[in-house]
């Protein structure tokens, strides 16, 4: 028989059952109070949880205030990355994982096309220029080349608009058209379209143009006024505009890291369609933030796996036709329209 049972029966005889029952209830209540007083870890955890919730709410408020403040800056400030603090990005919209970067795609295109001339807008550190072995021109108002280059190069430290206004802009190419171009300049749709118009005029039917940042991963990356460190701007609008106004072009969006790439072929240097329509696109291009990015862009259903594009035998045939001076390569380029999309 247990000691507690023996003591309990003895107390029942001496004090009476009702008194003993009151004492037992008081004992249980006392034990509970003591446990609560001694459970320091639980009380600290509770306070920590409350503090984290408060800090999270404060952090979200500060982030919202920062995004609002950044949105009141000028367009010029949106490209000034030096010494600026950006808001943390939003979660990315789910999309198929990209297996290649833009530079890896560009490198493979250099190998496949062996371009005689290469033109680039947006030199920055020179990482993409380093891929070229052709006679090359690079345009960027603030480039800081930090890598070894291996091409016959002329650079212009000015905006692309100023460059295209020069009478001697393409003298370095000695009259040859652009074989391969990479547009990675100002991340605003009207600038990107103007760059494409000017580049196409100096291309041939067999030329290839690559445009970066056409597949933002969330709406914040697509803001016209930069808020986050990772920024694509509203260049994504180019895909819709080109598809609508220039159905003759072959457009192949690629699922590349980080923010997608657009390959454009079947060019027509004589076309004036885009230039004629440019002024009428103002409202569409300059729509205020936040931008309404189409779902097939965010999810990349519209895109092609870059490996499929690069594996096509179109490239070898395109080089042969280019070197032979063939004028009509449209049927060849149209084969790329058959590449399966991720959606």
Regions found by a protein language model. Name each.
Residues 3-182, 186-210, 214-343:
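A short alpha-helical cap/connector motif
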